[in-house]
Swiss-Prot record:
It is found in: Cytoplasm. Its EC number is 2.7.4.25. The keyword Transferase applies. It comes from Methanocaldococcus jannaschii (strain ATCC 43067 / DSM 2661 / JAL-1 / JCM 10045 / NBRC 100440). Belongs to the cytidylate kinase family. Type 2 subfamily. GO terms for molecular function: ATP binding; CMP kinase activity; dCMP kinase activity. Disulfide bonds: none annotated. It holds the Pfam family Cytidylate_kin2. The keyword Nucleotide-binding applies. One of its GO terms (biological process) is pyrimidine nucleotide metabolic process. Keywords: ATP-binding, Cytoplasm, Kinase, Nucleotide-binding, Transferase. This is Cytidylate kinase.
């Protein structure tokens, strides 16, 4: 089984992807973890590394290559904004593609709590990072992140608590046509 979960920062992708991986005994692979690790290796914060990646498309290409190779092995929850796009572009049809969304203010609040920073700082960083990513994805892949047509399920995670979102996703998985 191959499941992709994507969404903008602060929508709950990591939380739910971990829970789904555990429940269904799947591996959890997160593009964001790979990206953060690469930023750390280069001694940059996420905003700096995002800007750097705009000029160095090999960063995104390496993340994508790793995701596709892992997906080919199956039994995985791939978490990342481009996970579904990358698999489809490489001829791999996931069993379920999911996109999480939530209002900007809600996401900023979640990020401020998670990273223990001021909400306004979180909002500013989030807006900068998203603008950088949108630009990169359009230039490198010709992907518009606002195009949600490839997703089987789009969930506004501000409408339910974590358990509610988990139940919705679990129900979708349990009811997939065999």
């Amino acid at each position: 089984m191959i499941i992709t979960i994507g969404g903008l920062p602060g929508t709950g992708t990591t939380t739910i992807a971990k829970m789904i991986a555990e429940k269904y005994n799947l591996r959890h692979v997160c593009a964001g973890f790979i990206f953060r690790e690469m930023a750390k290796e280069m001694g940059m914060d996420l905003q700096e590394f995002s800007k750097y990646a705009e000029q160095h498309k090999e960063i995104d290409e390496e993340i994508d290559r790793r995701q596709v190779e892992i997906a080919k092995q199956g039994n995985v929850v791939l978490e990342g904004r481009l996970a579904a796009w990358m698999l489809l572009k490489n001829g791999i049809k996931p069993d379920l593609t999911i996109w999480f969304k939530a209002p900007l203010e809600v996401r900023a609040e979640r990020i401020s709590k998670r990273e223990n920073i001021d909400k306004d700082v979180a909002l500013k960083k989030m807006i900068e990072r998203e603008a950088s990513e949108k630009k990169r994805y359009k230039e490198i892949y010709n992907i518009d992140l606002d195009d949600l047509s490839i997703y089987d399920l789009v969930i506004d995670t501000s409408k339910w608590d974590v358990e509610g979102v988990f139940n919705i996703v679990s129900s979708a998985i349990d009811n997939l046509k065999k």
